[in-house]
């Protein structure tokens, strides 16, 4: 919103006197909201953002600029951006009707220009961003990013912010190796499993992580160790 003021001056008989100052508030007719379709993120995900612009006035708003900060935050002496705009993903809908692809500068920041909002109507902008290596992976982390709408005769800029939390969960991968690769009858084989957790929370006993390995032909005299410690054999 914008505040304006006014003061009158009265001149008479060679003298001057000023009135009191009156203040008014210019109400903005444009509102903006921003939401993410996905409820959480992990590194490498694509997030879909929906920006809705609603014009409650009686005059169309034209040639607006929408700027997304792509979640930039201070790091060292500069700024890093955890989101990367996905090329050609931006779409615009006016009253639910698809429009021509908007002019986009990928940034950062992401800048979308030439946006129009009809009188008494709404415009929806949809675009995607890739969660990159600068997205904080630690548990309870978030990506907070803001869009700012300017131009089109607006008295002041309009902003809308969305916060997406990290997915607090383990992420396991397993790799299997065999040594030696070539064997003869009755020769011992060593199978090695490497399990890695790239998530942000540990795997605990209640997660019931189980390795199942089916041998064909069936092997005998099995010995299982975990980090050098023998495990109970169950065959």
Residue ranges and their predicted role:
Residues 1-235:
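Exported/extracytosolic protein signature
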